[in-house]
A protein has these predicted regions:
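Eukaryotic N-terminal low-complexity, Ser/Thr- and Lys/Arg-rich leader segments
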Residues: 1-20, 35-38, 65-66, 172, ...
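N-terminal small/polar loop signature for handling phosphorylated ligands or for N-terminal nucleophile
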Residues: 56, 60-141, 232-294, 360
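Proline/glycine-rich low-complexity loops and linkers
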Residues: 94, 103-108, 159-195, 199, ...
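Buried hydrophobic positions in well-ordered alpha/beta secondary-structure cores of metabolic enzymes
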Residues: 26, 74, 111, 130, ...
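An N-terminal, well-structured beta->alpha segment
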Residues: 1-91, 95, 122-123, 183-213, ...
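Gly/Ser/Thr-enriched, mixed-charge loops and adjacent short helices
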Residues: 14, 122-123, 140-276
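Phosphate-binding and adjacent anionic-ligand microenvironments
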Residues: 280, 318-502, 507-540
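Conserved phosphate/anionic-ligand binding catalytic regions in large, soluble enzymes, centered on
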Residues: 19-36, 221, 371-375, 384-390
Length: 540
């Protein structure tokens, strides 16, 4: 079960820059060799050190003395490096005297739930949880997400853990590996988690045993960890699930990228709905913290449309509440939430943790918020401990469907589609990622971040001279501009030397009007923001 490398193996690897493994509030790295230019940096020994560091961090957070024995849950998605990293993480924790609950194949939301569940038979609650996943990234990548009963860890926590891991790693190189003293217990936690989802739907339908009976729902798990939703959630609720696809875990992801934002993935679930004449289609990402849906006509319920749908459900339950979203949501969504639903739209930054933390902050100031969502498919609700849970979000849709069917047994997914009726949607949506050449003379030895900020300031100057363009008066990220029947947002990536440019227009003909603004030159880039818009017309 434990990794078998000795101290000499550690010494042969040399120095490891642990901080380079940080990806915001997650850890990401290359775990499998074979891709040119991508050397392995998430080895079993590195994983052991990170796991031991998390245990030390957790012990400190709980203000427990060194004699306290922690219980940490460990789960993984379908990646081909999952088992070796699970064993390494297990050894890292048990070698420092703490116990491990091994869940095996699991979803990210389930790992957080395990810190809340009161179930002595299944050894819960856990003091903390580790999910081994790299979301929708290629097969050679992997990583970790960490949880306590307070939710997912933040960037500062991750930095602390990686600094601890670096010291532990160096110490193990000098002293060799420690013997395992903690206890490992295998737990079927996904059955507990799925049972909670089933009970939530039954409750919404007046405790009817099979509230989805007669409905045909297909699921696309993308060969990730979401296949459980068919046998453990939908079938017990009475749904027909024939035509569901890619439910078997396969870390090579042979059919499509398990990502609700991916065009091929959405086409796959749409085709499954149409081919099987299903009432509803559901698609998950690899670790089930994101999701999207498709109605019976093949209409995609994702991005702005899914946020509109969830907003309608939540605002019906909590009138006037604030909906927090990421920065690239549409102007039409703002109008829909505020004018049609009577809520408040608070557009914030990209990054699911940023959006969730902002909703939590608003509540702490007295501004009620019950929903935080990203266009990527991350969605978190106050009622669900602010966990971004793709399965729970789909359960909210099923609750609405099941509740409506108690009044009209023949009703289908149109009841969901109708909730987003009136949302003004873009004819053209484009994202172009503009890379900053860090060797360009214009940088003059400075950082890409300083250079990117100077481009944003220059853009503001350009916008102020055009009466047809209007900068958003309140914006938390980048420069957002409306005009010519659409809007665009230019922002600086959180981690990479990239300026993502998002553009939306209501009518495709107006896209070309917007693209004709190429006269506005950017001194810094020698290109124009609007010529990128023009380039986008060729891509779209």
């Amino acid at each position: 079960m434990a990794a078998t490398q000795g101290a000499s193996d550690v010494l042969s690897i040399g120095k490891v820059d642990f901080l380079k493994l940080q990806n915001g509030s997650d850890i990401r790295g290359v775990a499998i060799a074979g891709v040119e230019g991508e050397p392995v940096n998430l080895t079993e020994l590195v994983a052991e050190a990170i796991a031991a560091a998390f245990a030390a961090w957790l012990l400190n957070k709980k203000k427990a003395d060194g004699l306290r024995r922690l219980r940490i849950s460990v789960g993984h998605d379908s990646r081909i490096s999952a088992h070796k990293l699970q064993n390494a993480v297990t050894h890292g924790i048990t070698a420092v005297g703490h116990d491990v609950l091994q869940f095996g194949l699991a979803s990210t939301p389930a790992m957080f739930n395990s810190t809340l569940t009161e179930d002595a038979i299944h050894h819960c609650p856990a003091d903390g949880g580790i999910m081994i996943t790299a979301s929708h990234l290629p097969y050679n990548r992997n990583g970790f997400k960490f949880f306590t009963s307070d939710g997912g860890l933040n960037k500062t926590d991750i930095k602390d853990i990686l600094e601890r891991a670096s010291r532990i790693y160096e110490e193990s190189a000098r002293c060799g590996k420690q013997e395992q003293t903690g206890v490992v217990t295998h737990v079927d936690y996904m059955s507990i988690y799925a049972s909670d989802l089933v009970q939530a739907v039954r409750k919404s339908a007046g405790n009817k045993e099979k509230p989805l009976e007669g409905l045909h729902i297909v699921v696309d798990a993308g060969n990730g960890a979401g296949g459980f939703f068919v046998d453990k959630v939908l079938k017990p609720l009475g749904a027909v699930t024939d035509g569901s696809q890619f439910l078997e875990p396969d870390g090579l992801f042979p059919n499509h990228i398990p990502n609700p934002e991916d065009k091929a993935a959405m086409e796959a679930i749409t085709q499954a709905v149409l081919n099987n004449k299903a009432d509803l289609g559901i698609i998950f990402d690899t670790d089930v913290d994101r999701s999207a849906a498709v109605d019976s006509s093949g209409r995609e319920l994702n991005r702005n449309r899914l946020i509109a749908l969830m907003s309608a459900i939540v605002l019906e339950e909590h009138p006037g509440t604030t909906v927090v979203t990421d920065s690239v949501t549409s102007d039409g969504l703002t109008v829909f939430i505020e004018k049609k639903l009577g809520g408040k739209h608070h557009r914030f930054k990209r990054g699911y943790k940023n959006v969730i933390d902002e909703a939590i902050r608003l509540n702490s100031t007295g501004e009620e918020s019950h929903l935080a969502m990203e266009t990527s498919g991350h969605g978190a609700l106050k009622e669900n401990h602010w966990l971004d849970d793709g399965a729970y979000m789909m359960v909210k849709l099923l609750n609405k469907l099941a509740g409506a069917r108690t009044l009209n047994p023949n009703i289908g997914s149109k009841v969901l589609t109708d909730l987003a009726e009136g949302l003004e949607e873009a004819a053209v949506t484009v994202e172009i990622r503009l890379k900053i050449d860090q060797n360009h003379a214009d940088l003059k030895g400075g950082s890409f971040r300083d250079y990117g900020e100077s481009i944003l300031k220059h853009l503001e100057s350009v916008i102020s001279k055009d009466p047809n363009l209007h900068k958003a008066p309140k914006n938390h990220e980048g420069v957002r501009v409306s005009g010519y029947g659409g809007w665009f947002l230019l922002r600086l990536s959180l981690h990479d030397p990239v300026l993502p440019l998002n553009i939306e227009v209501i009518l495709s003909s107006l896209f070309f009007q917007l693209s004709n603004l190429r006269k506005h030159q950017s001194i810094k880039t020698k290109l124009t923001i609007m010529s990128y818009v023009h380039a986008g017309t060729k891509q779209g």
